[in-house]
Amino acid sequence: MPSEPFGRHNATNTLISITQDDTMTHIKPVIAALALIGLAACSGSKTEQPKLDYQSRSHRLIKLEVPPDLNNPDQGNLYRLPAGSGAVRASDLEKRRTPAVQQPADAEVLKSVKGVRLERDGSQRWLVVDGKSPAEIWPLLKAFWQENGFDIKSEEPAIGQMETEWAENRAKIPQDSLRRLFDKVGLGGIYSTGERDKFIVRIEQGKNGVSDIFFAHKAMKEVYGGKDKDTTVWQPSPSDPNLEAAFLTRFMQYLGVDGQQAENASAKKPTLPAANEMARIEGKSLIVFGDYGRNWRRTVLALDRIGLTVVGQNTERHAFLVQKAPNESNAVTEQKPGLFKRLLGKGKAEKPAEQPELIVYAEPVANGSRIVLLNKDGSAYAGKDASALLGKLHSELR
């Protein structure tokens, strides 16, 4: 276990330590007739890449934009993580959850990017871009998501992370005459898929001047909350690696890769190891087999998928600082109330409480890594969800 402090910014700019002894879709009915009409058009499924037509809360066209400091020569320093011996000051891993500031982009931003390829490891896919730094790709990522119907919830260039707002894939809603009529009179919003998606986008500086880009999908589904089916609630839904792949393919094309080439890269099947060779649970820890660098990359994406948002990381100390995602059902409800609340103009949700932070320690061991969950003071995390979190992480990494 590391004896060096590991920390990030808080109100008192304190440090935290890890010590040697620590162990580690449906359409909601307005009336029966509407439900029948909607369901009648909802048959069949696609085996090809899904149709995508996302809309966020703003419902507005957003022009290609560039962060205000794109041309700032010091911007590249935002991506440097603290390394070396000694204490890691809290300010080194300060969260920068700032609202997006929009500026028109120069035409040069749209020039094709050379050397883009899709890598795959099990169900995980990511892009590798040669010769481009995260600072150069950042404005393209931001513009890409906005042009695909997602508002940006937060962006943290210091750790290369961007998070979208929840959005609905309107392509899943049947295109019938009644819906078109409602759209014309401004009531198209009462149609809903009962599903919402969001993405956590991560970009990291890789070896030999490459940038690695990851898209982690999160989903929510609206279900009936009682036997009488008079209320609905939002529940987490499994992440969809195929949807991640679809957007990675789109981003490849956005960077100038030929459409057919991008789709062929996405469809290529990897060589998978046996099911039990990649990870297993041992007590209160998770053993992940294989190359340490590969395991580190896979763990980052897995943490995003299971609701532990990485807000700081230090490869020298083998540690991630993570924050539990707020109650996602509250977040979706605040953004998109249920049908009857939308019709009545009600349903404003309370602001979610700040979530606790944890340390995910990835200790190098023979033939792999040992992952444990810790409190910020370095003690073993013993929350009631500890086993569930470890199990979810195992499901992503096995």
Swiss-Prot record:
Any one Pfam family match given in the protein's UniProt record, by short name: Lipoprotein_18
InterPro entries per UniProt: BamC_C, NlpB/DapX
Taxonomy, superkingdom: Bacteria
Note: Present in outer membrane vesicle formulations which are used as vaccines in human.
Name of this chain's protein: Uncharacterized protein NMB0928
Native source species: Neisseria meningitidis serogroup B (strain ATCC BAA-335 / MC58)
